[in-house]
């Protein structure tokens, strides 16, 4: 396995969240010895304010404009993720959300379990505003970029971290090989239904 990976986040309309994920991606938390780690932000039908801010930041970015701008938003989101994966110039990809703050060694711990077969995902700690999904933890360190208590987060994440794996769970951050992502047919567009019931809620929790 070639030791290169690109961490990719989407951004839509929030300059605050853009600044948050920019600071996280540019931090030492997204560096790992022995790996070539790239970072990129994909502007997903982004607002002029977001695009102007991106131009000011020292980070690679690409602009995606959906061919069906009036389509259901989840369909557009997953088309953008597919675009992000297909256009990556790296052999391995890690998708993250723009509202995420990373813990120490999060990336190296994910890569320990990246075997080219399974898709490892990080355990999420969420604020508790909405019910968390499988293996998720509810603990409030702030519910917006301006409210985040980084010191509290660092202490709490260090306290609960474990080097173990479980089946299922939430869907990002996740690591996979680009070639396998393409060979799989990419993400389906929008929600997946079973017996008429959506399996993916709008906030991204697999039931």
Set out the residue ranges of the language-model regions:
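Short, well-formed alpha-helical segments that are part of the catalytic scaffolds
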Residues: 14-29
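Acidic donor-binding segment of Leloir-type glycosyltransferases
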Residues: 25-69
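Glycine-rich, basic loop-to-helix element that forms the pyrophosphate-binding segment
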Residues: 67-88
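A recurrent flexible, glycine/aromatic-enriched loop bordering the glycosyltransferase active site
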Residues: 78, 153-178
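Short aromatic/hydrophobic "clamp" motif used to bind/position activated sugar donors
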Residues: 93
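Conserved donor-nucleotide/metal-binding helix-loop-beta segment in metal-dependent transferases, i.e.
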Residues: 105-121
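A short, conserved alpha-helix in the catalytic core of glycosyltransferases
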Residues: 110, 168-176, 180-185, 191-207
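Short beta-strand-to-loop element that shapes/binds the nucleotide-sugar donor at the catalytic cleft/hinge
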Residues: 120-140
